[in-house]
C-alpha cells in the first residue's frame, strides 16, 4: 500500500492504502 495504491483506491472506491 502507498501513494500508487491510494490512487487506485480512489478508483475502486476503497479507502486509500487498502490496495485492491
From Swiss-Prot:
Name of the protein this chain belongs to: Unknown protein NF042 from 2D-PAGE
Organism name: Naegleria fowleri (Brain eating amoeba)
Other remarks on this protein: On the 2D-gel the determined MW of this unknown protein is: 25.0 kDa.
Amino acid at each position: 500500500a502507498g501513494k500508487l495504491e491510494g490512487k487506485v483506491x480512489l478508483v475502486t472506491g476503497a479507502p486509500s492504502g487498502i490496495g485492491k
